C-alpha cells in the first residue's frame, strides 16, 4: 500500500471511529483495496466493552440487523465526506468471525463463555472455555479426559494467542446460562 493510500485509510478509520462511538461500537479493522474498476472497503466492527463490567459476563455478538444498521451509517458517512473520491466502491461491513485470532485483551473479553484453543510461548496448545477475562489476563476452564475440570490462568503479557473453536450441537442458550 502506498503512503497516500495508507494516509487515506487512516483518515477514513478516524472518521468512522467517530460515527461508531455513539453507537457503542469500535472499529476493529479497516481495509481499502483495489477490486477491478472499483475499490473494496472492508470494515470490521464490534461492540464497545462495558466499563468496569463483570469479567465473567458474556457479551452478546452483533446480530444481522445491527450490522445492517451500521452498514447504512458507514455508507452515509463515506458518501458525506467523499472519503472515497470519485471511484466507485463496494462496502463490506461485518463483525469479527470465529476465524479471527484472539490477540488483544478485548478479544478474549468478548469471548467469555466460548471454547478456545490457547497457545502460549513454549507450551502445548490448550483447549478450554474462557470463564473470566479482565485487563490483566483470563481464566480458561479445561475439562480433562474423565470430566474433571481445572482452571488455568494466563496473562496477556505472556504473549498468548487464542482461536475460537466451533462447537457443533451446543445451543446458544446454553452459553452463559448462569449469567
Regions found by a protein language model. Give the residues of each.
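Short Lys/Arg-rich amphipathic alpha-helical segments
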Residues: 1-179
Amino acid at each position: 500500500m502506498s503512503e497516500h493510500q495508507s494516509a487515506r485509510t487512516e483518515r477514513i478509520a478516524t472518521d468512522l471511529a467517530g460515527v461508531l462511538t455513539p453507537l457503542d461500537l469500535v472499529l476493529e479493522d479497516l481495509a481499502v483495496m483495489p477490486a477491478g474498476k472499483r475499490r473494496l472497503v472492508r470494515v470490521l466492527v464490534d461492540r464497545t466493552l462495558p466499563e468496569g463490567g463483570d469479567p465473567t459476563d458474556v457479551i452478546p455478538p452483533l446480530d444481522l440487523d445491527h450490522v445492517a444498521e451500521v452498514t447504512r451509517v458507514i455508507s452515509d458517512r463515506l458518501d458525506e465526506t467523499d472519503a472515497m473520491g470519485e471511484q466507485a466502491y463496494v462496502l463490506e461491513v461485518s463483525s469479527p468471525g470465529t476465524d479471527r485470532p484472539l490477540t488483544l485483551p478485548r478479544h478474549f473479553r468478548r469471548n467469555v463463555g466460548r471454547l478456545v484453543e490457547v497457545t502460549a510461548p513454549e507450551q502445548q496448545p490448550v483447549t478450554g472455555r474462557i470463564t473470566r477475562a479482565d485487563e490483566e489476563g483470563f481464566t480458561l476452564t479445561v475439562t480433562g479426559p474423565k470430566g474433571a475440570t481445572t482452571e488455568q490462568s494466563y496473562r496477556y503479557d505472556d504473549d498468548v494467542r487464542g482461536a475460537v473453536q466451533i462447537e457443533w450441537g451446543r445451543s446458544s442458550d446454553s452459553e452463559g446460562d448462569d449469567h
